[in-house]
């Protein structure tokens, strides 16, 4: 398994936006409103991109080991946003493996001393999507795991700047809203 760590906020936010902007065939999706909610209440600060061969039966344990090795502050962790991309023949993704990974992610803040009440409080949200990318080789899978953390005062001050950067990033994908209908649909004469 190959993996890459990203800590640049703008790069992580672009990766999250790409879940909605790509041409991948969406099999399990989240709403864009969910992404907006994550960004409103938390800040993307860390991401792991893992390229996996589905024939590797230990991939879940390998990802868990990578996550645990990152030394990220668990106490301010809010949520995970996970994008799973498989190739055309990659539908052999095991539900049991996916469940095991999701179970780890949602309980990452649990301790041995947790009571039932504190477990409910320490539960970590994990939103995920699954898409198919035909350009991926058979049996290949990519997991993009993005983490949001509590907003600091500095994060709040920088929010507007990052929002403007994302708006600029999205422009090529969407026509401007101030164009007349004839310019939006030039082939439609009526």
Regions found by a protein language model. Give the residues of each.
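Tubulin/FtsZ superfamily GTPase core signature
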Residues: 1-190
């Amino acid at each position: 398994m190959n993996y890459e760590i990203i800590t640049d906020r703008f790069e992580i936010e672009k990766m999250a936006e790409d879940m909605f902007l790509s041409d991948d065939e969406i099999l399990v999706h989240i709403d864009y409103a969910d992404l907006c909610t994550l960004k409103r209440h938390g800040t993307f600060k860390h991401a792991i991109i893992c390229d996996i061969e589905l024939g590797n039966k230990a991939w879940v344990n390998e990802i868990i080991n990578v996550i645990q090795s990152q030394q990220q502050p668990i106490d301010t962790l809010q949520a995970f946003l996970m994008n799973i991309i498989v190739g055309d023949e990659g539908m052999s993704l095991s539900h049991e493996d996916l469940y095991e990974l999701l179970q780890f992610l949602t309980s990452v803040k649990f301790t041995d001393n947790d009571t039932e009440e504190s477990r409910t409080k320490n539960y970590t949200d994990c939103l995920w999507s699954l898409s198919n990318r035909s350009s991926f080789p058979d049996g290949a899978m990519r997991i993009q795991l993005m983490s949001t953390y509590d907003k600091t005062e500095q994060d709040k001050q920088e929010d507007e700047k990052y929002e403007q950067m994302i708006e600029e990033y999205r422009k090529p994908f969407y026509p401007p809203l101030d164009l007349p209908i004839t310019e939006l649909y030039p082939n439609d004469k009526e």
